[in-house]
């Protein structure tokens, strides 16, 4: 981790073998709805699917192998999940998707945590 140079935004290790499954709700027109500069473009989820999957994977064509590439997630990616209830995190039928473990510098308040994770109860 962090053995290569950072990208122009100071982020390390942004590209790998799989696309990144994020918590953001997927909105196809999200970039068109934005102001010119956005500090935190997080789209608060209102449902479990679709989520935004960013970047490319080993299965993708060259034009998708960039951080800006976006696609929606699908509940079909859990079709063969043997768990009952199905896992929130395991995409049995999407070996091209992974996730990045991150944490905030400051621990969010209980209210912020509830807001952030409340989509799971929908």
What are these regions (language model features)?
Residues 3, 14-122:
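Surface-exposed recognition segments
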Residues 6-9:
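Short loop/turn microsegments at loop-to-beta-strand junctions
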């Amino acid at each position: 981790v962090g053995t290569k140079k950072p990208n122009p935004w100071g982020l390390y290790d942004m590209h790998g073998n799989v696309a990144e499954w994020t918590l953001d709700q997927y909105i196809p027109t999200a970039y068109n709805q934005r102001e010119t500069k956005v500090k935190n473009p997080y789209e608060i989820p209102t449902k479990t699917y679709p989520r935004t999957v960013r970047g490319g994977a080993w299965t993708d064509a060259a034009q998708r192998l960039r951080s800006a590439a976006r696609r929606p997630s699908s509940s079909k990616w859990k079709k063969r999940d043997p768990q009952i209830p199905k896992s929130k995190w395991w995409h049995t039928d999407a070996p091209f998707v992974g996730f990045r473990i991150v944490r905030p510098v400051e621990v969010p308040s209980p209210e912020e945590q509830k807001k952030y994770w409340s989509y799971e109860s929908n």
